[in-house]
Design a protein with these regions (language model features):
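Alpha-helical tetratricopeptide repeat
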Residues: 1-113
Length: 113
């Protein structure tokens, strides 16, 4: 894998696109990260991390409904990751859904204990 500006070369599989998306995200390039995560889910639609990471990128851009949608998909795939609920709770807060935010925060705490 060759690197230019700390970004991986063109990926060939879903995990490669997630890795590239993560590199974009670390650099604050959320639109490019979203594009990479989207390619990952197009190749393999059962990767909870791809939906989670794309949801986080949407969250960072203030696209809270899109974030909630992707974070919900991540939870559908893997309902046992407390981080998914914690991040969706934050998105619900900014989407002015305090009851849903509290429910997710409660679930997050349950999973951590």
């Amino acid at each position: 894998m060759t690197r230019k500006n700390n970004l991986p070369s063109e990926p060939t599989d879903a995990l490669g696109f997630i890795t590239r998306g993560n590199a974009y995200s670390r650099n604050g390039a959320y639109e490019q990260a979203i594009d990479s995560y989207t390619k990952a889910v197009e190749l393999q639609d059962d990767l909870a991390d791809a939906y989670f990471n794309r949801g986080v990128s949407y969250y960072e851009l203030g696209e809270f409904q899109l974030a909630i949608s992707d974070l919900s998909r991540a939870i559908d795939i893997n309902p046992y990751d407390d981080n998914y609920y914690g991040r969706r709770s934050l998105a619900y807060i900014f989407a002015d859904e305090p009851d849903l935010a509290q429910a997710d925060q409660d679930r997050c705490e349950e999973l951590r204990n």
